[in-house]
Amino acid sequence: MSATNTLQTNVYVDWNNDGDFDDLHDSITSDILEMSFQRGRDYASQLSGKSVAGKLTIRLENDTAKYSPDNSSSALFGSLLPGRKVQVRGVVGTYNTFPYTFPFTFNNLTETVIWTGYLDRITPMPSPHGVDTAEIVVFGVLGYLNDTYRS
């Protein structure tokens, strides 16, 4: 028996603004092509550096125009609005592997909120050659509180 540490990242958007992330399209994890974070201080110095809002940029697959605000046939039409709550969650823990198969598993995995922010903008990026994408920009709670999350 061996224990293995795991980490899987899941991203959720509360598209209908109902306070949960349980609705059909709230998980955007399967559409993510690329994701990057920026957070911390504008300078490394504690004396002159200022805290800045975290920023999450996600590039999503958008072949069906699901993330295109003008697409009236999208399941998310009317919900692709600034200010929607976004959560990044990590699935962390251990799982046990055995040299033979049981009809059940011995897992100790937990999904934990790693980061929370608010949607700033969605920019569809159609491509004449290849995959249509959309870029989502999200600012952290500090930016939301300072009202600087809006462009």
Spans of model-derived segments:
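Assembly/oligomerization scaffold segments
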Residues: M1-S151
